[in-house]
Curated annotation (Swiss-Prot):
It holds the Pfam family Mito_carr. GO terms for molecular function: branched-chain amino acid transmembrane transporter activity. This is Solute carrier family 25 member 44. Solcar repeats lie at residues 18-100, 107-210, 220-302. It is a multi-pass membrane protein. InterPro entries: Mit_carrier, Mitochondrial_sb/sol_carrier, Mt_carrier_dom_sf, SLC25A44. The gene is SLC25A44. The chain crosses the membrane at residues 20-42, 71-90, 113-133, 185-201, 222-239, 278-296. It comes from Pongo abelii. Its main location: mitochondrion.
Length: 314
């Protein structure tokens, strides 16, 4: 009799692709809405010099809420929703790469590491231009200039709204840097997210496997998968946060050199500057990763081909 503690990974060939994509887009959108405020806060914390404006995640949350209201926590959100495309490309690349690597290695760690890195490469190629625009929108604060660019305002001093701001930022990027400006920080993004993704998946499966041995046989897999996700996210965040800080500064401040940005950060703020925004990153990653893991594993189970439904333990 099959041991229910054994986690059977649902692979690409087991899925009903139509269900997978329809459910996947809806799930991703819900996650984006829930975690976007902390993404915005993390971006502002990483770009500010020292503690010139915000003294931490909670302080930033309160100040933004008081100054701009709830909409202030969602600056750039409409533009950021276009990353839904990259999200679907990510999961497709991940699953197809796992299938390809399986022909050469049955090690789940190897499959997860290679697939995670490959998926991130594809996704970042789509995401970076969207991130560049949305990050500049995140830095708009009641007409005050926090980044390189500032949207034009109306007579009352308020910035133009929605896609008016977006078009204004796009024009300024084009004037300042040309088309290359939309891929500013591309290499830094790859150096951040490829390792992050490559590390997250093996740690996720490792933690899930270890927890499965500690839990009773009757414990639903989804429980220890939900715990494993945040553990893997925290591990990956700690390892990759220094590069994430540098990536954000390169993209928002318009710097051309990763090395010079690193040196300037070290000179101004020391080694602790590399950990800026880490708490916001982990705070945003914890609930979002639980939702992602529960959602993604449930999505795959709901998308199983009919003849395989009874063969998977929840």
């Amino acid at each position: 009799m099959e041991d229910k503690r054994n986690i059977q990974i649902i692979e690409w060939e087991h899925l009903d692709k139509k269900k997978f994509y329809v459910f996947g887009v809806a799930m991703t959108m819900m996650i984006r809405v829930s975690v976007y405020p902390f993404t915005l806060i993390r971006t502002r914390l990483q770009v500010q010099k020292g503690k010139s404006l915000y003294h931490g995640t909670f302080d930033a949350f309160i100040k933004i809420l008081r100054a701009d209201g709830i909409t202030g926590l969602y600056r750039g959100f409409l533009v950021n929703t276009f990353t839904l495309i990259s999200g679907q490309c990510y999961v497709t690349t991940y699953e197809l790469t796992r299938k390809f690597v399986a022909d050469y290695s049955q090690s789940n760690t190897v499959k997860s590491l290679v697939a995670g890195g490959s998926a991130s490469l594809v996704a970042q190629s789509i995401t970076v231009p969207i991130d560049v625009v949305s990050q500049h929108l995140m830095m708009q604060r009641k007409g005050e200039k926090m980044g390189r660019f500032q949207v034009r305002g109306n007579p009352e001093g308020q910035g133009v709204v929605a896609f008016g701001q977006t078009k204004d930022i796009i024009r300024q990027i084009l004037r300042a840097d040309g088309l290359r400006g939309f891929y500013r920080g591309y290499v830094a993004s790859l150096l951040t997210y490829i390792p992050n993704s490559a590390v997250w998946w093996p740690f996720y499966h490792f933690y899930a496997e270890q927890l499965s041995y500690l839990c009773p046989k009757e414990c639903p897999h989804i429980v220890f998968q939900a715990v494993s996700g945040p553990l893997a996210a925290a591990t990956a965040s700690i390892l990759t946060n220094p590069m994430d800080v540098i990536r954000t500064r390169v993209q928002v401040e318009g710097k051309n050199s990763i090395i010079l940005t690193f040196r300037q950060l070290m000179a101004e703020e020391g080694p602790w500057g590399l950990m800026k925004g880490l708490s916001a990153r982990i705070i945003s990653a914890t609930p979002s990763t639980i939702v992602i893991v529960v959602g993604y594993e449930s999505l795959k189970k709901l998308s199983l081909r009919p003849e395989l439904v009874d063969s998977r333990h929840w």
